């Protein structure tokens, strides 16, 4: 059996959330008892908690919702590239060493340990010119082990607007702590949330061959 790497953080009331966004909450609506045969809970959360796929609707009014996105970009060969010392922005030179025969999907590890239990504004993001460069190589999906491909303080979301213009899909909040650089199969399908600006994904990598 081919090896799998689960690159999704756990989702719970401890999950970090962008300041002002909706945290994870769960309450039990029904509970097992002599009168009730099942447990059923109600969950409220932002679709940007945990590993998730942003939809164009997140950064453009009237654009495509998460559940209406084609699934092909979220499934197939991908490359994991380490850029652990990149600083606040991932630049093309941080990835150029791994650019030969680039597959259509690229995930970048920027942190020694992904922040799965705490929020921090101090994370790495993609420089817009890096996304332009990746698009020129035929990349259709980018991913990162931080909450956003733009800096936390950005009000213009320049990198998000590049992926909108270039029709590139994006995965955020991945956990790549135990994944070595190299090529894998990515499986990270968004849910069919046909009105949503993003969707949780259960992102996994599978060895090739």
UniProtKB/Swiss-Prot annotation:
Zn(2+) 1 binds at residues 48, 52, 54, 172. Its cofactor is Zn(2+). Pfam families: Cyclase. Pathway: Amino-acid degradation; L-tryptophan degradation via kynurenine pathway; L-kynurenine from L-tryptophan: step 2/2. One of its GO terms (biological process) is anthranilate metabolic process. Its EC number is 3.5.1.9. SUPFAM superfamilies: Putative cyclase. It catalyses: N-formyl-L-kynurenine + H2O = L-kynurenine + formate + H(+). Keywords: Hydrolase, Metal-binding, Tryptophan catabolism, Zinc. The active site is at residue 58. Substrate binds at residue 18. Catalyzes the hydrolysis of N-formyl-L-kynurenine to L-kynurenine, the second step in the kynurenine pathway of tryptophan degradation. Belongs to the Cyclase 1 superfamily. KynB family. HAMAP family: KynB. This is Kynurenine formamidase. It comes from Bordetella avium (strain 197N). The lineage of its organism: Bacteria, Pseudomonadati, Pseudomonadota, Betaproteobacteria, Burkholderiales.
């Amino acid at each position: 059996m081919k090896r799998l790497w689960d690159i999704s953080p756990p989702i719970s009331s401890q999950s970090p959330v962008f300041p002002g966004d909706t945290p994870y909450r769960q309450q039990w609506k029904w509970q097992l008892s002599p009168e009730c045969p099942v447990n059923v809970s109600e969950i409220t959360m932002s679709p940007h908690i945990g590993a998730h796929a942003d939809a164009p609707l997140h950064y453009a009014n009237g654009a495509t919702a998460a559940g209406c996105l084609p699934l092909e970009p979220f499934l197939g060969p991908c490359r994991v590239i380490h850029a652990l010392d990149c600083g606040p922005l991932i630049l093309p030179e941080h990835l150029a060493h791994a650019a030969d025969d680039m597959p259509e999907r690229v995930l970048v590890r920027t942190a020694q340990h992904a922040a799965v239990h705490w929020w921090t504004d101090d994370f790495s993001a993609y420089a817009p010119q890096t996304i332009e460069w990746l698009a020129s190589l035929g990349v259709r999906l980018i991913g990162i082990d931080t909450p956003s491909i733009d800096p936390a303080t950005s009000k213009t979301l320049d990198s998000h607007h590049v992926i909108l213009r270039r029709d590139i899909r994006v995965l955020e909040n991945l956990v790549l702590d135990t994944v070595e650089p190299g090529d894998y199969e990515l499986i990270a399908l968004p849910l069919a949330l046909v009105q949503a600006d993003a969707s949780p994904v259960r992102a996994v990598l599978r060895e090739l061959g």
